[in-house]
């Protein structure tokens, strides 16, 4: 029997067996989940009548499906998926929505879904489904039986997804008993830590004797942990009365058998013993999760001593399922740790257990050819790092590919997987990230007996992080099958199972729980409040206003509709600005990038920006007025246009004069030392040129107006002024270009041009080996000589065009002259392109070197030219078409002249071939002749090559001169473009005046006035030409062409824009005045001789307002009691708009009369007044902002008042640390940065060098696990909303081993967003303290943004809350 027939018979037998099974109700090794009968009326039968009659004496197998509308459709037996099958006719259908069937609806739907998944479930599910007839009733009998999972464990777990029909069946059949303890709980971080702490609290007195090899004394709670860890390793925990985790039992409803169920894995069995075999949960090891700084390292070392590899296992092997091979037992404990604390581990081992043999494994790539794992067998502890394991995965057998052929070079294999470690300890396991990372995959592959993950913060961001720990522990089968079992717990919210899983696996003590045993020195949390300096305050206020404008805060003072990312960005910028104006990418960009500036430099930059903006706004105002004049000139109101231009002329001429004086003084008088403050930051020459162009427009337009008014005298006067100014604008480029042209004219005369020698023909005859080569040469030499003539022709044309004089040197060019000059420029451009390509062709023919770039550029220019010709043909521009066709001929001429070196070979190639032919010649005559031709042609080739190089140098001079001409015409074009009429929308009369009587009247008056003037102008022209055309028709035609409605519409827009621009000018004028006064007081330390506007006396102590006015302190305080606006300019004043000027000329920000000091938060301590005074009096050499200065002063204070103080300075932003480092360097504070490859060296130096006062830490520096107990001070540079990041920093010093009180300082800037953030942070701390936690309940403990600069990630609700509080200080006037 062939294979096809056999398969067909087997398939038919399988179908028959499956069909017959539907008629069964009892199955061996199965649990009957349910068995029901559905009684129906015979009248619903839709199948064949004869089959219905047959049912009276027999039973009939059916399958059924419940559709989305809850209607049951029954069919004859089929293996097809009913929901997808077409053309299936049901035997009968039933609406299950009727009350009669409500009790059976759930099991019917479950049966239906299970049958849909039959192909996947048929090994573990047995179906019952058949119909019979009894009297007038049609009876549907249906049921489900579940196979004992021990018979098909893999099928069971693969079928048990959280959304699978099999899981729904188990949940329906084995409904766990209601447990009030779990009913009100959710699976979250708090639940996990609660489980861990419950286990810790349940540990009783430890009966562990002290090992003499351990040099340190264990605290009572550490002894209890040690005993628990030892028990986890040496026992199976499961007694005869216990079930493994995740299992529970219940009694069968159909018999007296006990059933054991595991919902998570999808297991069901009748034997308690089989539960251990299916999923015992009996891993040896667990998760040690004591709070940071509680001595987990010592607990692990204690375990190493107290529980070692049994002697019976020494020199024996075991089979490891993961690596799939036998591996020898090693007594060693493998400790895997972050590289940042690896040296710390080594020193701790040496300190606490010096007798143990330790080996530092640096990975296969660094271990000097270590190939054998024998060295591990003799060690007690082997230490390696995550960074080394990251590459180790590449050297595991299970990771390498199977090759078809044996490799010549066999890569070394990692020795880590060649032994079965007695114990693996993964320290700071939360840093392994995901189970898919290389480090996690490598740890998973390492054979082990016991495994521990150690972490004070096992949850980094969410509960799902715990899966990674289970993966490292090889908690089977939890980590298998694509997290299916784990997702069961999370998605189905199986709280009881979650607690069952982690309740015995994780142990966690908090400092609060064992406070009496721990006896750590007290920790003081101190709030260090400061205020922004006046410069920083100005910048902060600007940022607030920008944020409010960007987020549309002033519309409804709400942020509900704002984009979360925009809010996040602004909150970050505001927080960063509290540290320094340049912190963060956004703030740094706003200040032009570059290195961190001192506060004085920040002030100068702000002043420069204000000056630039003020100047630009003034130019815009004048430019818009000029356009208004152009509109009036267009509508024939010449006098109005002339009046506007004449009015604008005065301030523009004044601005030009002032700039000319500034430039003159900078150049000849004081060399820029006494530059007026109002001109800081301006590129004077560029600004002067822009003002010149503006003034040129005014002169030109005034001259054109006088032309229209027939005033020849003033017309000529202003045209001359415009011409003189144009030459002034162009003076630099004229001088530069003229110089280039003069030098060009001197060099490019016939006598000095490169001479191109002709090549000579070869007359060699009678050659056999060299005959073909000589023929190729004679063809090539002729083409090179022909190309030479074309090349010289193009060079001569180029030189002629380049020597043409520039326009506007002596007099204004006519339109024709201007066009001719521009055409000459275009021709030069094309000639250069063609000439460069011809040179490239010649080089290729001589040396064989092909310049593909030049070829590409030439083809591109040719393509553009062809497209231009097509465009000209469409637009019927004959002149442009003829001109471009002329240029196209240049490209064609070059192509015709190109030597065909690709056919004959280059000269160098011919020379090489001749030499080869000479060497191959057998007769002396032919050898001699070949060598003679070789030498002659070689000499010509070398000469031609040198000539090509000289020609290329010539071309580079031509190109340089041409670039100079381009710059000249570019500037001339810019001036010409500035005189173009403004773009105007084309608006019809009807559309413009629609439903607006006022507009109609104004438009009519303009048209009437324009018509009168047009009529007069047309009549005068006709009189001069003696013509008699209908004047009225011409006037109407002109009026229509003038688009008067469009111009009037533009006029309205300009009038509106004018008021907006004037408002901005007033604002920036006030700001400039304000910043100028700040500069004089802060930078120049100038004595104030300004008079108080109120009392008319000289100001000694007073206030400066943000509008730039100064008042005596007494006068302004009295004034503000009755008014809230500036006495001078009526600008609204609030708590953020006035700054105190002391007698020492120092300027301070908001004082009590403006805002009052914030009361300190009672949840934090505060320094006494004397300490504050001493810190404030510390002198700094350079200021970098209020907060940075306060930190630097505080460090200097500690240096003066303590013996070798050690301080950890922490920030979430690298930029903050950068500016701190600059301040430290400037003020003699010795520091070291914990970053980069030298982290371990940093720690060693910080611990050993007494003079090293400060260690700076960044949020992304992976400082978890660091022990810095030699430090007693922690400076938190900014308040944090993520308490996990904060605790990571603080726990570096507040931990076991600390013998002195520790101090944590929070630096807060008053009346900024930081105040609200601190309040939120303290509230979070209170919540965590109540729960006895030191980690956040939600959010990522180390989650940061901006990979280069860090920064905590803040939740959306907190972002909005903080921003709203920050923006509240803005008034409507700030908008």
UniProtKB/Swiss-Prot annotation:
Q: Which GO terms describe its molecular function?
A: ATP binding; ATP hydrolysis activity; ATP-dependent activity, acting on DNA; helicase activity; ubiquitin protein ligase activity; zinc ion binding
Q: What is its EC number?
A: 3.6.4.-
Primary location class: nucleus
- Binding-site residues, ATP: 290-297
Q: Name one GO biological process term.
A: DNA repair
Q: Where is the signal peptide?
A: none
**Matching CDD domains, A to Z?**
DEXQc_SHPRH (cd18070), RING-HC_ScPSH1-like (cd16568), SF2_C_SNF (cd18793)
- Gene3D superfamilies named in the record: P-loop containing nucleotide triphosphate hydrolases, Tandem AAA-ATPase domain, Zinc/RING finger domain, C3HC4 (zinc finger)
Q: Which GO terms describe its cellular component?
A: chromatin; nucleus
Q: Report keywords, A-Z.
A: ATP-binding, Helicase, Hydrolase, Metal-binding, Nucleotide-binding, Nucleus, Zinc, Zinc-finger
Question: In what residue span(s) does the Helicase ATP-binding domain sit?
Answer: 277-476
InterPro entries, alphabetically?
ATP-helicase/E3_Ub-Ligase (IPR052583), Helicase_ATP-bd (IPR014001), Helicase_C-like (IPR001650), P-loop_NTPase (IPR027417), SNF2-like_sf (IPR038718), SNF2/RAD54-like_C (IPR049730), SNF2_N (IPR000330), Znf_C3HC4_RING-type (IPR018957)
Q: Does the keyword Metal-binding apply?
A: yes
Zinc finger residue ranges, RING-type: 1092-1130
Stretches assigned to the Helicase C-terminal domain: 1190-1336
Concerning SUPFAM superfamilies, the annotation shows:
P-loop containing nucleoside triphosphate hydrolases, RING/U-box
Where in the cell?
Answer: Nucleus
User: Any keyword Zinc-finger?
Assistant: yes
Q: Which family does it belong to?
A: Belongs to the SNF2/RAD54 helicase family.
Put simply, this protein is called Uncharacterized ATP-dependent helicase C144.05
């Amino acid at each position: 029997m062939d294979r096809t027939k056999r398969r067909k018979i087997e398939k038919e037998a399988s179908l028959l067996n499956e069909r017959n099974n539907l008629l069964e109700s009892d199955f061996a090794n199965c649990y009957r989940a349910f068995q029901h009968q559905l009684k129906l009326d015979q009248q619903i039968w839709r199948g064949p009548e004869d089959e219905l009659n047959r049912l009276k004496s027999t039973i009939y197998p059916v399958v059924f499906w419940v559709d989305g509308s809850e209607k049951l459709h029954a069919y004859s037996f089929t293996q097809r998926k009913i929901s997808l099958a077409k053309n299936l006719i049901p035997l009968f259908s039933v609406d299950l929505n009727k009350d009669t069937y409500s009790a059976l609806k759930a099991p019917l739907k479950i049966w239906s879904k299970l049958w849909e998944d039959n192909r996947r479930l048929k090994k573990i599910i047995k179906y019952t489904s058949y119909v019979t007839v009894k009297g007038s009733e049609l009876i549907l009998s249906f049921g489900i039986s579940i196979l004992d999972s021990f018979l098909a464990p893999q099928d069971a777990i693969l079928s048990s997804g959280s959304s699978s029909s099999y899981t729904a069946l188990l949940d329906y059949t084995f409904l766990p008993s209601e447990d009030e303890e779990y009913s009100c709980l959710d699976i979250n971080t708090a639940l996990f830590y609660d489980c861990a702490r419950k286990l810790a609290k349940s540990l009783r007195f430890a009966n562990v004797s002290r090992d003499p090899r351990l040099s340190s004394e264990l605290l009572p709670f550490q002894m209890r942990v040690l005993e628990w860890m030892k028990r986890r390793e040496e026992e199976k925990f499961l007694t005869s009365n216990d079930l493994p985790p995740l299992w529970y039992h219940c009694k069968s409803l159909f018999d007296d058998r006990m059933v054991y169920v595991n919902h998570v894995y999808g297991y069901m069995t009748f034997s308690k013993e089989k539960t251990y075999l299916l999923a015992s949960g009996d891993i040896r090891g667990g998760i040690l999760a004591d709070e940071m700084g509680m001595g987990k390292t010592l607990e692990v070392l204690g375990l190493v001593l107290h529980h070692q590899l049994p002697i019976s296992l020494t020199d024996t092997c075991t089979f490891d399922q993961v690596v799939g091979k036998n591996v020898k037992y090693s007594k060693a404990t493998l400790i895997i740790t972050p590289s940042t604390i690896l040296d710390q581990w080594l020193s701790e081992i040496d300190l606490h257990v010096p007798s143990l043999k330790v080996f530092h494994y640096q990975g296969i790539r660094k271990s000097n050819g270590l190939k054998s794992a024998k060295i591990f067998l003799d060690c007690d502890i082997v230490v390696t790092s995550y960074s080394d394991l990251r590459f180790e995965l590449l050297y595991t057998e299970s990771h390498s590919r199977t090759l078809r052929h044996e490799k010549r070079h066999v890569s070394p294999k990692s020795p880590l997987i060649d032994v079965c470690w007695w114990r693996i300890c993964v320290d700071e396991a939360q840093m392994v990230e995901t189970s898919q990372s290389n480090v996690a995959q490598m740890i998973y592959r390492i054979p082990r007996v016991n495994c521990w993950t150690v972490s004070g913060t096992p949850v980094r961001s969410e509960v799902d992080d715990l899966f990674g720990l289970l993966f490292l522990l090889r908690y089977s089968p939890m980590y298998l099958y694509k997290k299916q079992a784990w997702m069961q717990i999370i998605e189905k919210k199986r709280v009881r199972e979650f607690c069952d899983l982690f309740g015995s696996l994780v142990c966690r003590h908090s400092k609060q729980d064992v406070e009496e045993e721990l006896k750590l020195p007290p920790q003081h949390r101190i709030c260090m409040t400061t205020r922004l300096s006046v410069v920083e305050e100005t910048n902060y206020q600007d940022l607030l206003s920008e944020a409010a404008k960007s987020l549309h805060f002033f519309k409804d003072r709400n942020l509900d509709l704002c984009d979360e990312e925009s809010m996040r960005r602004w909150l970050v910028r505001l927080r960063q600005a509290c540290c320094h104006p340049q912190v963060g990418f956004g703030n740094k960009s706003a200040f032009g990038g570059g290195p961190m500036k001192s506060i004085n430099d920040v002030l100068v930059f702000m002043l420069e920006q204000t000056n630039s903006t003020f100047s630009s706004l003034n130019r815009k105002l004048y430019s818009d007025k000029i356009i208004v004049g152009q509109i009036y000139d267009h509508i024939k109101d010449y006098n109005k246009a002339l009046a506007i231009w004449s009015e604008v002329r005065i301030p523009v001429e004044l601005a030009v004069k002032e700039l000319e004086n500034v430039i003159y003084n900078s150049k000849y008088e004081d060399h820029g030392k006494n530059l007026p403050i109002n001109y800081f930051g301006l590129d004077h020459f560029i600004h002067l040129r822009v003002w010149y162009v503006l003034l040129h427009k005014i002169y030109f337009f005034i001259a054109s107006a006088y032309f229209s008014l027939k005033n020849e005298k003033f017309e000529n006067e202003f045209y001359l002024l415009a011409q003189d100014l144009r030459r002034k604008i162009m003076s630099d480029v004229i001088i530069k270009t003229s110089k280039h042209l003069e030098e060009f004219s001197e060099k490019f005369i016939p006598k000095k041009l490169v001479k191109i020698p002709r090549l000579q023909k070869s007359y060699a005859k009678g050659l056999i080996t060299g005959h073909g080569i000589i023929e190729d040469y004679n063809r090539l030499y002729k083409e090179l000589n022909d190309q030479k003539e074309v090349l010289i022709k193009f060079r001569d044309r180029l030189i002629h065009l380049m020597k043409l004089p520039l326009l506007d040197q002596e007099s204004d060019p006519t339109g024709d002259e201007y066009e001719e000059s521009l055409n000459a420029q275009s021709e030069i451009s094309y000639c250069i392109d063609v000439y460069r390509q011809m040179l490239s062709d010649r080089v290729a023919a001589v040396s064989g070197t092909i310049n593909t770039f030049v070829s590409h550029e030439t083809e591109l220019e040719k393509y553009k030219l062809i497209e231009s010709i097509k465009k000209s043909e469409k637009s019927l521009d004959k002149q442009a078409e003829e001109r471009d066709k002329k240029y196209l001929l240049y490209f064609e001429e070059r192509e015709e002249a190109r030597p065909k070196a690709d056919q004959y070979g280059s000269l160098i190639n011919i020379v090489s071939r001749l030499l080869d032919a000479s060497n191959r010649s057998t007769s002396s005559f032919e050898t001699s002749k070949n060598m003679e031709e070789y030498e002659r042609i070689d000499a010509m080739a070398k000469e031609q090559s040198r000539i090509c190089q000289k020609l290329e140098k010539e071309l580079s001079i031509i190109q340089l001169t041409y670039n100079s001409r381009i710059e000249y015409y570019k500037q001339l074009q810019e001036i010409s473009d500035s005189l173009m009429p403004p773009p105007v929308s084309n608006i019809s009369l009807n559309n413009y005046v629609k439903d607006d009587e006022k507009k109609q009247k104004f438009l009519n008056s303009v048209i009437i006035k324009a018509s009168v003037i047009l009529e007069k102008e047309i009549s005068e022209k006709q009189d001069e030409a003696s013509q008699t055309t209908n004047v009225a028709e011409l006037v109407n035609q002109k009026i229509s062409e003038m688009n008067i409605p469009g111009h009037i519409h533009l006029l309205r827009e300009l009038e509106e824009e004018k008021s907006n621009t004037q408002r901005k000018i007033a604002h920036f004028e006030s700001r400039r005045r304000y910043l100028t006064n700040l500069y004089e007081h802060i930078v120049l330390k100038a004595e104030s001789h300004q008079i108080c506007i109120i009392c008319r006396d000289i100001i000694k102590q007073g206030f400066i307002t943000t509008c730039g006015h100064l008042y005596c302190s007494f006068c302004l305080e009295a004034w503000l009691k009755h008014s809230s606006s500036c006495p001078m300019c009526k600008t609204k004043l609030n708590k953020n708009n006035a700054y105190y000027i002391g007698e020492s000329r120092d300027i301070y920000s908001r004082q009590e009369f403006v805002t009052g000091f914030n009361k300190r938060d009672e949840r934090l301590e505060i320094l006494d007044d004397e300490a504050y005074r001493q810190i404030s009096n510390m002198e700094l050499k350079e200021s970098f902002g209020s907060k940075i200065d306060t930190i630097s002063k505080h460090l200097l204070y500690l240096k003066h008042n303590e013996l070798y103080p050690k301080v950890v300075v922490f920030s979430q932003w690298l930029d903050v640390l950068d500016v701190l480092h600059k301040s430290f360097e400037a003020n003699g504070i010795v520091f070291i940065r914990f970053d980069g490859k030298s982290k371990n060296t940093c720690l060693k130096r910080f611990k050993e060098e007494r003079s090293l006062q400060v260690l700076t830490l960044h949020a992304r520096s992976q400082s978890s696990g660091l022990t810095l107990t030699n430090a007693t001070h922690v400076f938190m540079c900014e308040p944090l909303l993520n308490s996990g990041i904060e605790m990571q920093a603080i726990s570096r010093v507040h931990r076991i081993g600390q013998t002195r009180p520790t101090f944590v300082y929070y630096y807060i800037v008053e009346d900024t967003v930081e105040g609200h953030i601190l309040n939120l942070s303290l509230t979070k701390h209170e919540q965590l303290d109540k729960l006895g936690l030191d980690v956040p309940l939600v959010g990522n403990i180390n989650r940061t943004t901006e990979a280069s600069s860090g920064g905590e990630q803040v939740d959306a609700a907190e972002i909005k809350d903080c921003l709203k509080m920050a923006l509240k200080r803005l008034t409507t006037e700030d908008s």
